[in-house]
């Protein structure tokens, strides 16, 4: 008989690698890189010339947890709208510039916190870097070198045949070296591709070449589901390796959805304070309640909460009681009723038609009792719930 020595389990290794050490830059009031929290960005979809609509969308993004917002600037009329938008926006504004270098200077003069430049399509960009560096330095404006697979320099496409990770990295490193030749260092870099595998490798190569802060993004990621999967896959790999200082989830969906997904990715990796989390079973033939409807009603009813609260909505007696006990608050449903758990203890059993009402009331009561620190986490010693 072969003996098996079970012994003591090995000490668990950290899931995430230490954060990559980079220089720090500022995008207005938001630090990017070094020890700054990883920020979430989005981009408005309104015409920038429609100042009121753009500011309204920025306000919605801010409320959803967006840290930095980007606005398009394809024309002089858009450039003329930037001063008001930059002044009235509650979060730092970055102007997105393509083709015309004059709009880089217009954005700097308008008071934007940052400018994104695309070296692949701005006319004679390399010749413009000295002037851009001086103007940005004088105004305290940071730059993003935004390399994109869809607009890569033709010389690199000829060299590599297509937008490979090496081509994206080489473009970024070249442009970074030109800015640094003019003693400008207040920039971050992105190397975006619509294929997450190519994008991941490009960022890994770039991270090996310098200490620049990196803006993560999968370009043209697609509709909500597809884009979420692509971004979560790519960001999860890179962030777990300590690579990435600010993120933008690109979706063919309202920009607020980009922010929600971005925040969820960071929270799932423990890189942003946990907030409301709904745990619900996928449902199966054992379910004795409409779990989909129940979970959606609870999620909608608690969407206003910003405290770290885990709520479990379970549809049967197999995993239901265990999951509900592990959550801060939960329900295990069956036989036309639901057992309500708080901190692992059953506090009451209610009829099925009262489950949602009871969970919402209990969750709000628990949220009100929480005392949170400046990072949105429970204060030690305060009357709080314990996360499962």
Curated annotation (Swiss-Prot):
Its cofactor is [4Fe-4S] cluster. One of its GO terms (molecular function) is iron ion binding. Binds 1 [4Fe-4S] cluster. Residues 1-22 are annotated as: Disordered. Gene3D superfamilies: Dihydropteroate synthase-like, Sulfite Reductase Hemoprotein, domain 1. GO terms for biological process: isopentenyl diphosphate biosynthetic process, methylerythritol 4-phosphate pathway; terpenoid biosynthetic process. [4Fe-4S] cluster binds at residues 281, 284, 316, 323. Its EC number is 1.17.7.3. Pathway: Isoprenoid biosynthesis; isopentenyl diphosphate biosynthesis via DXP pathway; isopentenyl diphosphate from 1-deoxy-D-xylulose 5-phosphate: step 5/6. Keywords: 4Fe-4S, Iron, Iron-sulfur, Isoprene biosynthesis, Metal-binding, Oxidoreductase. It catalyses: (2E)-4-hydroxy-3-methylbut-2-enyl diphosphate + oxidized [flavodoxin] + H2O + 2 H(+) = 2-C-methyl-D-erythritol 2,4-cyclic diphosphate + reduced [flavodoxin]. It holds the Pfam family GcpE. Converts 2C-methyl-D-erythritol 2,4-cyclodiphosphate (ME-2,4cPP) into 1-hydroxy-2-methyl-2-(E)-butenyl 4-diphosphate. Belongs to the IspG family. This is 4-hydroxy-3-methylbut-2-en-1-yl diphosphate synthase (flavodoxin). It comes from Kocuria rhizophila (strain ATCC 9341 / DSM 348 / NBRC 103217 / DC2201). The gene is ispG.
């Amino acid at each position: 008989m072969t003996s098996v020595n079970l012994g003591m389990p090995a000490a668990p290794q950290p899931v995430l690698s230490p954060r990559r050490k980079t220089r720090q830059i500022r995008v207005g009031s938001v630090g990017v890189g070094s020890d700054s929290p990883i920020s979430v960005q989005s981009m408005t979809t309104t015409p920038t010339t429609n100042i009121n609509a753009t500011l309204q969308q920025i306000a919605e993004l801010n409320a959803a947890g967006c840290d930095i917002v980007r606005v398009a600037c394809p024309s002089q009329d858009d450039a003329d709208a930037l001063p008001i938008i930059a002044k009235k926006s509650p979060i730092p504004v970055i102007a997105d510039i393509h083709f015309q270098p004059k709009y880089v200077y217009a954005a700097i003069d308008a008071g934007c916190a940052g400018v994104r430049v695309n070296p692949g399509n701005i006319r004679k960009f390399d010749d413009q870097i000295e002037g851009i560096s001086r103007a940005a330095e004088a105004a305290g404006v940071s730059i993003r070198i935004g390399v994109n697979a869809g607009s890569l320099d033709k010389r690199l496409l000829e060299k590599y045949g297509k937008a490979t990770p090496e081509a994206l990295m080489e473009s970024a490193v070249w442009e970074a070296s030109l800015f640094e030749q003019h003693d400008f260092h207040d920039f971050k870099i992105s190397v975006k591709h619509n294929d997450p595998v190519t994008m991941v490798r490009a960022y890994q190569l770039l991270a090996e070449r310098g200490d620049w802060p990196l803006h993560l993004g999968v370009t043209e990621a697609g509709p909500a589901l597809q884009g979420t999967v692509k971004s979560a896959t790519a960001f999860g790999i890179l962030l777990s390796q300590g690579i990435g200082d600010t993120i933008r989830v690109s979706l063919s969906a309202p920009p607020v959805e980009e922010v929600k997904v971005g925040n969820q990715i960071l929270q799932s990796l423990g890189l942003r304070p946990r907030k409301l989390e709904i745990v619900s079973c996928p449902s199966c033939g054992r379910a004795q309640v409409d779990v989909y409807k129940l979970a959606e009603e609870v999620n909608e009813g608690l969407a206003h909460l910003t405290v770290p609260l885990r709520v479990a909505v379970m549809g049967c007696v197999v995993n239901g009681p265990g999951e509900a006990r592990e959550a801060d608050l939960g329900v295990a449903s069956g036989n036309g009723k639901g057992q309500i758990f708080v901190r692992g203890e059953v506090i009451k059993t209610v009829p099925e038609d009262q489950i949602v009402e009871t969970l919402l009331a209990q969750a709000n009561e628990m949220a009100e009792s929480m005392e949170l620190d400046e990072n949105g986490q429970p204060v030690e010693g305060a009357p709080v719930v314990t996360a499962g």
